[in-house]
Design a protein with these regions (language model features):
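An amphipathic alpha-helical interaction segment
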Residues: 1-23, 27-31, 62
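Hydrophobic recognition helices of helix-based DNA-binding modules
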Residues: 2-9, 39, 67, 91
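Basic/polar phosphate-binding segments, predominantly the helix-turn-helix DNA-binding elements
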Residues: 21, 38-84, 96, 102-127
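Charged, low-complexity surface patches
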Residues: 28, 57, 91
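Short, leucine-enriched amphipathic alpha-helices that occur as contiguous helical runs
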Residues: 28-36, 80-88
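Short Asp/Glu-rich motifs
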Residues: 87, 121, 137
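Generic C-terminal helix-cap and adjacent flexible tail
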Residues: 130-137
């Protein structure tokens, strides 16, 4: 199991595994896991593809290809997922304004944050917060 993420709700977890990849792919999987771990830890930063490739001693085109091959996501999609997950945590556990949460998780533009959040959660951040409050009562 490479990593997992929750998008719609805590009960619906999607898992990404490497079981379909052959043994000679081990180094690709390790590289992708290291990059995914870095992105998960540094989700609020905006690293360029060139910076990521340099950090992990690889070519940006190769990194892009293997990341998508192993995870099924582009690097940008994976970073968005990490940011949305963190935003979900803040929306559930705090009363911080949505604008502040967007900035805290790495989105510079609140409208873009709301668009990405809606893409992965099928509801706006405000709707998500209200639904989580209703479920906990």
């Amino acid at each position: 199991l490479l990593f997992s993420f929750r998008i719609k709700s805590e009960g619906n977890a999607a898992h990404i595994s490497a079981k379909n990849l052959i043994g000679s792919e081990t180094e690709k999987i390790r590289t992708v896991n290291r990059v995914a771990g870095y992105l998960a830890d540094h989700y609020q930063e905006s690293s360029s593809l060139d910076e990521l490739a340099s950090r992990f001693f690889t070519n940006k085109f190769y990194l892009t290809r293997i990341f998508k091959q192993v995870t099924g996501f582009t690097i940008r999609e994976y970073l968005h997922i990490q940011r949305v997950q963190k935003a979900q945590e803040f929306l559930r556990s705090s009363l911080l304004p949505i604008t502040e949460i967007a900035l805290m998780v790495g989105f510079e533009n609140v409208s873009y944050f709301e668009k990405i959040f809606r893409r992965y959660c099928m509801q706006s951040p405000r709707e998500y917060r209200v639904s989580q409050k209703a479920e906990s009562h």
